[in-house]
Amino acid sequence: MALFSSRTGKRPRIVPALDDDALARVLRQVSKRGGGVKSTEVTLVAGFLEETGDNWDRRSHRVSVLAGETAESGSDLASAWLTRSPKDPDALVFHSWVGLMHGLRDRHLEDAGQLVTQCHRAAELSPADPLPWVVLLGMARIERYPQSEVNAIWREATGRDRWHREAYLQMLAHLSPEEGGSSAAVLDFIDVVRARIPANAPCAAIELTAAVRQYQGLVAQGGVRAMTADQLWNGGQIAASLEQAASLWAKPGFFQHAAAQADLNVLAYALCAAGRAVDAHHVFEALQGTVTPWPWDDDGPAVQRFEQHKAKAERGRQGGVRGA
């Protein structure tokens, strides 16, 4: 993977595919408009995911991005593919993921029973694939399954791919206070998984992701909590985790997973939130202008906020002032 290689700096922009050039080409070829879908588009996406094979990390990234773009555009791609190939596990998973994207947006699943059935059918047809179980984890967020059922789905997903990034993110969201969980549940989850996850695993950013969400939650409350939110980064396990991430993640070749640039966005944001903009400079450089909507869009347009913090990091580096 050519992550953080010889690309020249580019103007900040949102790139759903991140550094997956093959995925970017497919996205450009698939219609962005709702309504009718050409059979060639179905063939293109089906062939593309088939070629991805059993690289579960890369497959998850590609399916999630394609599903997200399909849901946002209102395209009939998922339905057209499932109609054409109702026994294709890729078609079943893709259609279910698009349904999940709609459900997360609307906070309600249309025909949840059908989507669940599709996931189980996909799991039967492709038993080694963790993705049907990951989609079920996402559905559990909306349907608020009992924790025992969620844990069973979690074991199915991570039993197939122990460090599956999306599985960890879905579980984190399910446990969050914003979705009916609690801060204590999130902390318990992070405490359990922290020591087990390799430093460069696809899910390595889960602790920092949880910390950023906690920070944003404090800021959103306003008042004293917002004014003192930056204290979250001072001392303790969160500070230690941020320090380790700052020293390792942006090194060329350290991360190899498909969504590494998304995790670097989280790191850059966390360093800026902690008053360490100077330390974020090398992370911004590694990103080469690739912006993810979250976490930057929490308090304004993502690209604009990214540019502002990047400029602040550059000024601080030139002035030699830590936390500028």
Show the residue positions of the predicted features:
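Alpha-solenoid helical-repeat scaffolds
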Residues: R13-D20, G35, G53, P86, ...
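Extended alpha-helical scaffolding segments
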Residues: P252-D299
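Structural motif corresponding to the intra-repeat A-B loop/turn of tetratricopeptide repeats
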Residues: H102, L109, E143-R144, G180, ...
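Alpha-helical repeat scaffolds
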Residues: S5-T8, T40-F48, S73-S85, D111-A123, ...
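Long amphipathic alpha-helical scaffold regions
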Residues: I153-R162, L175-P198, P295-R315
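Extreme N-terminal leader/anchor segments
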Residues: M1-D76, A80, R84, H281-L287, ...
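Amphipathic alpha-helical repeat scaffolds of TPR domains
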Residues: G47-L66, P86-L104, P127-G138, R160-P177, ...
